[in-house]
A protein has these predicted regions:
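Metal-centered catalytic cores of metalloenzymes
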Residues: 1-78
C-alpha cells in the first residue's frame, strides 16, 4: 500500500489517500474533490474542474494520468 496526498494529485490540501494501485488513489482523489466541493469548499473547485476536464478530454488527460502513475510507482510502500 502507498499514500499520495490531495496536493500531490493536483488538489489544494494534504489529505492522504491510500491504495495498492495508482488507480485506487486517483479514484479516492476524485471522490474527495466531489465531496469537498459539495460541502462548499471553494479551494477544491479548480481541482475538481481540472478532473472533470480530464474525463471530458481523455486523450489530453492521459499526460496527467501517466504522471500520477509514475509518481505513485516511485513512492515507497507504507
Amino acid at each position: 500500500m502507498k499514500t499520495m496526498t490531495c496536493k500531490q494529485l493536483g488538489g489544494p490540501c494534504d489529505l492522504a489517500h491510500h491504495g495498492d494501485t495508482a488507480d485506487d488513489v486517483i479514484k479516492a482523489q476524485d471522490a474527495h474533490l466531489r465531496d469537498a466541493v459539495a460541502q462548499a469548499d471553494a479551494a477544491h473547485d479548480p481541482a475538481l474542474k481540472d478532473m472533470k476536464g480530464r474525463w471530458k478530454h481523455p486523450i489530453s488527460g492521459m499526460g496527467w494520468y501517466r504522471k500520477a502513475k509514475r509518481d505513485f510507482a516511485a513512492l515507497p510502500e507504507d
